[in-house]
């Protein structure tokens, strides 16, 4: 096996570094002389920023710390490669660098846009008769990648969201006062993360009263009527909402607070924020309730201290599966997770066509959403509950979790 190049792209997760560990250890086991890391993704490679991971991952303790370190160890980017037919320069530059470092396989850990990068690199490689293998490794807390049962990163984010919301529910019940709490959860176009709030429910907690997802347009009057009903029934009403919920006119609720915000290279609004504040103000003004808005923000994507062991394990497995696929000669593929059963929960990895993943989004199935569009049902529970099981204990130093950094 020739040398290997691996990068991380897009938003970080609590387990993206476990996938990096899977790529690194499997590549070394398969005989790769060097495993190079892209510093700051494909953008960093274009600037010649590579690191030999053998120099920074010296022993088993480093690997164990890597699995427990949140965010992207190598750094990330949101750089969109152009169509090579329009601008071939970056491709010429990249393939010259691949030749210089004797790269035989490139692995990119990321979401939809990262799979677009793998798709373009593999297609260009074919046109220039390159033997380099290009494989995608799935990563996103949004859980919106096609052709995989679920995406590494989601289980840990879901576990964090359910746990924190459960604690918010406890906190909201402290005083003998009626109130409505609105918790804003990430999710630009899909509601997988907000739906995870339902996992707070159990024998000691009822979970959130309402969950609003981008999959259903927001009906203001129906929403207010339901909140009014709930407010009469109980002291504290808890609402979970995706940041990307839109009204019937297709306008983000957060844009009704502010229209400010830049777009990233892929045409996405860089920051969605304000949905919970909009709803809290709406309820306060229209219903006269005491309200509070909470944004989980970036905390939900990097809480490695509360990571799902299932998620950590599967993240490592898809990294290893990607390398094994490259060794077999596969390219233009993504390592995916296939669910075999729920009881007991069992999965296996498989390789899927990356072109069928890039630039597509998987939404929460309509049949998993309640008829009124303001909650999820037991079908979601059966799907998501296995993904948050078990814990990976942090390695502590001075009373706080220890991490590893470049």
Task: Give, region by region, the residue ranges found by the protein language model.
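Short glycine-rich or small-residue beta-strand-to-loop segments that form or flank ligand, phosphate
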Residues: 3-11, 72-78, 104-110, 136, ...
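Short, ordered loop/turn segments at secondary-structure junctions
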Residues: 9-11, 38-44, 78-79, 111-112, ...
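Short glycine/serine/threonine-rich phosphate/pyrophosphate-binding segments
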Residues: 13-23, 45-46, 89-92, 112-120, ...
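N-terminal phosphate-binding or glycine-rich loops at protein starts, especially the Walker A/P-loop
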Residues: 1-50
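Glycine-rich oxoanion-binding loops at beta->alpha junctions
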Residues: 48-104, 113, 152-154, 166
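C-terminal non-catalytic interaction/assembly regions of soluble proteins
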Residues: 252-406
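Accessory alpha-helical/coil subdomains and C-terminal extensions
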Residues: 35, 97, 105-110, 116-128, ...
């Amino acid at each position: 096996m020739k040398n290997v190049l691996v990068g991380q792209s897009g938003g970080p997760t609590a387990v993206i570094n476990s996938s990096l560990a899977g790529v690194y250890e499997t590549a070394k086991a398969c005989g790769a002389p060097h495993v190079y890391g892209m510093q700051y993704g494909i953008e960093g490679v274009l600037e010649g920023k590579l690191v030999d991971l053998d120099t920074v991952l010296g022993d088993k303790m480093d690997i164990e710390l890597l699995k427990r370190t949140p965010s992207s160890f190598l750094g990330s980017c949101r750089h969109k490669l152009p169509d090579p037919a329009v601008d071939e320069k970056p491709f010429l530059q990249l393939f010259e660098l691949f030749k210089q470092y004797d790269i035989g396989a490139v692995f990119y850990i990321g979401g939809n846009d990262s799979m677009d990068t793998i798709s373009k690199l593999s297609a260009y490689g074919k046109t220039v008769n390159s033997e380099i293998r290009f494989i995608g490794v799935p990563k996103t807390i949004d859980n919106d990648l096609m052709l995989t049962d679920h995406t590494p990163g989601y289980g840990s984010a879901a576990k964090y969201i359910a746990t924190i919301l459960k604690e918010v529910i406890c906190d909201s019940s402290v005083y003998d006062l009626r109130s409505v709490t609105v918790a804003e959860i990430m999710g630009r176009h899909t509601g997988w993360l907000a739906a995870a709030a339902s996992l707070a429910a159990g024998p000691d907690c009822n979970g959130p009263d309402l969950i609003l997802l981008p999959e259903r347009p927001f009906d203001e009057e129906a929403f207010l009527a339901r909140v009014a009903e709930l407010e009469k029934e109980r002291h504290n009403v808890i609402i979970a909402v995706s940041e990307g919920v839109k009204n019937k006119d297709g306008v983000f609720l957060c844009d009704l607070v502010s229209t400010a915000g830049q777009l990233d290279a892929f045409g996405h609004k860089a920051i969605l924020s304000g949905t919970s504040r909009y709803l809290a103000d709406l309820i306060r003004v229209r219903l006269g309730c005491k309200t509070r808005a909470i944004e989980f923000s970036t905390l939900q994507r990097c809480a490695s201290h509360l990571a799902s062991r299932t998620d950590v394990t599967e993240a490592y497995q898809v990294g290893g599966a990607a390398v094994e696929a490259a060794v077999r000669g596969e390219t233009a593929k993504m390592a995916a997770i296939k669910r075999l059963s729920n009881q007991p929960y069992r999965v296996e990895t498989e390789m899927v066509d990356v072109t069928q993943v890039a630039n597509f989004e998987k939404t929460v199935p309509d049949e998993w959403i309640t008829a009124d569009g303001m909650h999820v049902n037991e079908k979601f529970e059966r799907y998501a509950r296995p993904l948050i099981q078990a814990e990976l204990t942090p390695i502590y130093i001075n009373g706080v979790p220890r991490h590893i950094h470049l």
